[in-house]
């Protein structure tokens, strides 16, 4: 392969990697925001003893 062809392949790989990484970054940010949200199910359980998150365990009811 010539230098132009190798450079073109390199640019395509960099571009493809950049395009693929953007949606996964946004999705993880959304999950982080949900986890940090003060009104999440587990945070509500401290005040109302109602939790719809399975991680709360049998101690709390869902209340839905």
UniProtKB/Swiss-Prot annotation:
Note: Negative results: shows no or weak inhibition on neuronal nAChR alpha-3-beta-2/CHRNA3-CHRNB2, alpha-3-beta-4/CHRNA3-CHRNB4, alpha-4-beta-2/CHRNA4-CHRNB2, alpha-4-beta-4/CHRNA4-CHRNB4, alpha-7/CHRNA7, alpha-9-alpha-10/CHRNA9-CHRNA10.
Highest taxon in the source lineage: Eukaryota
Any Pfam family the entry gives: Toxin_8
Tissues expressing this chain: Expressed by the venom duct.
GO function terms (MF aspect): acetylcholine receptor inhibitor activity; ion channel regulator activity; toxin activity
Protein name: Alpha-conotoxin SI
Protein family membership: Belongs to the conotoxin A superfamily.
Cysteine amide carried by residues: 62
Localization (cell): Secreted
Keywords: Acetylcholine receptor inhibiting toxin, Amidation, Disulfide bond, Ion channel impairing toxin, Neurotoxin, Postsynaptic neurotoxin, Secreted, Signal, Toxin
Disulfide-linked positions: 51-56, 52-62
UniProt cross-references to InterPro entries, sorted A to Z: Conotoxin_a-typ (IPR009958), Conotoxin_a-typ_CS (IPR018072)
